Amino acid sequence: MSSIMEKTDVSSSKHSFTFEPSSDEVGKAAEIVDTHENFYDDQGDIDNPEELAELGYKQEFRRQLSLFGIFSISFSVLGMLPSVASTLVFGLWYVGYPGLLWAWLIAMFFLICVSMSMAEICSAMPTSGGLYYAAAVFAPKGWGPLASWITGWSNYIGNIIGQPSVNSSAASMILGAVTVNRPDFVIQRWQWFLLAVAIQCFNCVLACLPTRIISRINGVATYLNTAFLFIAGITILAYGGKNHNFVKGTKIWGDYINTTQWPTGFAILLSFNSPIWTMSGYDAPFHLSEECSNASVNAPKAIVMTAVIGGVVGWIMQIIVAYTLTDIDSVMNTSGSMWTAYLVQAMPPKAALGILSLTIISAIIMGQSALIASSRIAYSYARDGILPFSGWIGTVNPYTQTPVNAVICNCIISILILFLTFAGTVTLDAVFSVGAVAAFIAFTVPIAIRVFFTKDADFRRGPWNLGKFSRPIGLLAVSFVALMIPILCFPSVKNPTAQEMNWTCLVYGGPMLFTLVWYAISARKWFKGPKASAHYKRPGEESSDIVEGVQADIPSSSDQLKIKGDL
């Protein structure tokens, strides 16, 4: 493209005009470009493409996501209502009521630290590759490709597994809703599978739409998710107050019911699985940054907003559930969904069915947002030649200007994973359990390298940064994840059966071991990290040429000032 910005449409006016700049004005425009000021139109179509070019990539997406738009997708990925429903087992099963409250409260602090460290990196390197690009840049000389390879594959495994797990959960809740009015209904595995595939295909269609439409859909979805949370919380409290069924505060804050064979303190750490799994999607703004206006500011803000708002809302929901869960034994011993058993206990069947319906809608919204985020990861990796069939996957659709092929690829992989429904719940749960572990390993690798190996003088901070608190906050984030990853791989008993075993190590370690062997035998010879990472400009360095094949055209100053629109 010869010029990125030759005309700008101002949709709010009715008269056309053309502005021809004087030589002084052209000089001022050049000065603006040199100081990396944001230059984009009111629609957010263009946002400092030279900034992306300095990172080595060509602007291929339309930047139509505002701060609210990118936050909407990220918040939808968290899916607070279905996430609370799905992770109720982790909070209750290990230590009872306190697992709901203390796990969220303590873990939330450290998860926000992780989000802040990630956001700082995002501000400095707002690319779709995100974490794996940063790992290559921060790593000591010679280690960049391996650090990037590990981060990239861990991130992709976490996202590609997390997305079908959401749709499987939604399908399970739909079938579970049938049993509320028909207790004799027996759920068949083929029904579960076909329903999950139908939801997956529906989400695939939505994820293929242009960014502008995706932004609007997820904007509405955010309002719906917020309304559903409010309705669910008020309804639960209303029925609890009507029936005078509130649990005493001393019981929910201090009555530990340790069902594991580990010490109570360790069991509490096991219950951290609930907030960690819920928060494993707040990296979405990083991967959508190339579609976001003012990305170096809005994308990191969206990451932190998602973590803080999601954490607070999630904790409030945990408190509501804890105070209204009068018969904890019946919920913990149910053969079906704990969430369904809890709702039926807390309110009449029709009201329970209504709240369950809202949870299902939120889960479907969550699934499409997760597919959007995972497709951007696949696109960015294919752009750098990591994935098989990268030439096809890394293509941007010329009509929608979104990575449609990456969406289709991830949809196919998700459907293949859903075939594990026929292998039984133990196998399915084992696969779906690795999502949070894989995601947080990917989150932490670049943060750890930044904290321990990268000098402050070598880190070109973005406009959103932590200043002098960067390293301390990063150290807290890395320490928390380093502690939790092994713990999340433990079973709840000391001599587990196949059903009691935590298969996370095997299910995550197997694919990662395969990728490491692949790297050792073949990939190390041709994979040198993200193609553009070698062109990252550190403080004091001159701008380097954009890597061949991903060159971005920088508009001239006069081109940027040629504005044609409607007054």
Swiss-Prot record:
Family to which the UniProt record says this protein belongs: Belongs to the amino acid-polyamine-organocation (APC) superfamily.
Cited InterPro entries: AA/rel_permease1 (IPR002293)
UniProt GO molecular function: amino acid transmembrane transporter activity; gamma-aminobutyric acid transmembrane transporter activity
Keyword Transmembrane helix: yes
Native source organism of the sequence: Schizosaccharomyces pombe (strain 972 / ATCC 24843) (Fission yeast)
Name recorded for this polypeptide: Uncharacterized amino-acid permease C1039.01
Organism ancestry: Eukaryota, Fungi, Dikarya, Ascomycota, Taphrinomycotina
Record field: transmembrane: 65-85, 92-112, 190-210, 220-240, 302-322, 353-373, 412-432, 434-454, 473-493, 503-523
Any one biological process term the GO annotation gives: amino acid transmembrane transport
UniProt cross-references to PANTHER family, sorted A to Z: AMINO ACID PERMEASE (PTHR45649:SF52), AMINO-ACID PERMEASE BAT1 (PTHR45649)
Main localisation: membrane
Localization terms from the record: Membrane
Membrane-topology descriptor: Multi-pass membrane protein
Recorded GO CC terms: cytoplasm; membrane
Record keywords: Amino-acid transport, Membrane, Transmembrane, Transmembrane helix, Transport
